[in-house]
Amino acid sequence: MSESSLQNEVAKRRTFAIISHPDAGKTTITEKVLLHGQQIQKAGTIKGKKSGQHAKSDWMQMEQERGISVTTSVMQFPYHNALVNLLDTPGHEDFSEDTYRTLTAVDSCLMVIDGAKGVEDRTIKLMEVTRLRDTPIITFMNKLDRDIRDPLELLDEVEDVLKIMCAPITWPIGSGKNFKGVYHLLKDETILYKTGQGHRIQEETIIKGLDNPELDEKLGVWADELREQIELVNGASNPFDKELFLAGELTPVFFGTALGNFGVDHMLDGLVDWAPKPQGRETDQQEGVSATSEDFSGFIFKIQANMDPRHRDRVAFMRIVSGKYEKGMKMRQVRTGKDVRISDALTFLAGDRSHVEEAYPGDIIGLHNHGTIQIGDTFTAGEDFKFSGIPNFAPELFRRIRLKDPLKQKQLLKGLVQLSEEGAVQVFRPLISNDLIVGAVGVLQFDVVVHRLRTEYKVDAMYENINVATARWVSSKDEKKLDEFRRRAEANLALDGGDNLTYIAPTMVNLSLAEERYPDIEFTHTREH
């Protein structure tokens, strides 16, 4: 393949994920983004569970029962001259580590905020993860078709709580029943809102300039209000600066309503124009890998079981970092040193699979996995390096897991280790007992695990509460000190699914004391795969 055609393929791609608090409208915005990409002719409405019209991006059986997106699915669609990869992230009350890890596989993020509620705690957590790589953030203030908080107050809150500068690109005219549309600060034009157009792309009425008499004609008293507001906004807010945006220090802000399908295209225009094309990545060698390098490489950031209820298969999601994937090509799995031929990679539109003939940097492909691929695995054209920056995150919730039938201990352990390799949950085996402790980032992961143990491994398990506040991976440069620590702190130590030594703390105070008592031991809350 010529270098210039590889560069062209890279230049037109944008790979991003959506971060939000549950119910801020992420699934609806995903629908509308796909509608603009012409993937779904009529956006699948996210309504009551009984309507039978399930959102296009919510799939496994459990999600369809509950109306939540538990798994990270991948959607690719064309928009203007770009090819956009959208990684959907589990967004409900609780998502899992998958959500965190997905953020390490994208080049930019769209942050969706409920205009009535402002910045919520899940959003704060997810923003912390994007900070690990200074990922550029675009913001969409949603639900303008309802009454929202004062827009300037919302911007202040984002700046204050998330420590990122805001540059408004569009500005709302009214909200709720009085929502009239938005003014585009960079284009100097007003775009009017029509209700009842949520399921299709609307013909927009655009009025150029703030002094245009047509504005008074169409908006009445709101026209003068808008002029005053824009004067205030121009004086009080940051102008858009692409370099600051790319450095993760400033976020362009768009206002709209995903449900009413208004403003989503303004945001997509910004994403395609400003968000970075696929970026290279750091490795464990001196040299990183550039996206335009001709040699193929990629890494696994997620493994999903049972996308196909008829087959007990698992699919490993790979982000391509460099080179070109071609059907039937050989690639090296660096961890095992084996060369594998991949002839049946997949692309997805949430649950609809299609086989890929070729794919490029920034694309996500699915590899069939019969238990041989793990999260964090690097695949190359033959070189031996490993991509860094695909972390495990310390769980925040813990349960002891018990069997209803004690004879199935072996199947339980097998199931839990496989589920932990997929990132569905983390498993800890205390050094001094036969307990099995399961750790998760969100409560829902526990339900998912019991459900999957029952349906995929025929194991009936239940949980008991356990007195664990947090876990930290432990290591030391001094082997003797580590051995001594292992002897003295044995009651609090466990091995995780990958046999890494872990400190299980009953309270945060206990953890602080342990860190003070053992200064030569490093306690970390993320661990590289």
From Swiss-Prot:
GO MF annotations in UniProt: GTP binding; GTPase activity; guanosine tetraphosphate binding; translation release factor activity, codon nonspecific; translation release factor activity, codon specific
Record key words, sorted: Cytoplasm, GTP-binding, Nucleotide-binding, Protein biosynthesis
Residue ranges of domain tr-type G in the record: 11-279
Residues noted as binding GTP in the record, renumbered to the chain: 20-27, 88-92, 142-145
Species classification: Bacteria, Pseudomonadati, Pseudomonadota, Gammaproteobacteria, Alteromonadales
PROSITE patterns reported for this sequence: G_TR_1, G_TR_2
Protein name, per record: Peptide chain release factor 3
Cellular component terms (Gene Ontology): cytosol
Gene: prfC
Organism: Idiomarina loihiensis (strain ATCC BAA-735 / DSM 15497 / L2-TR)
GO biological process: one example: regulation of translational termination
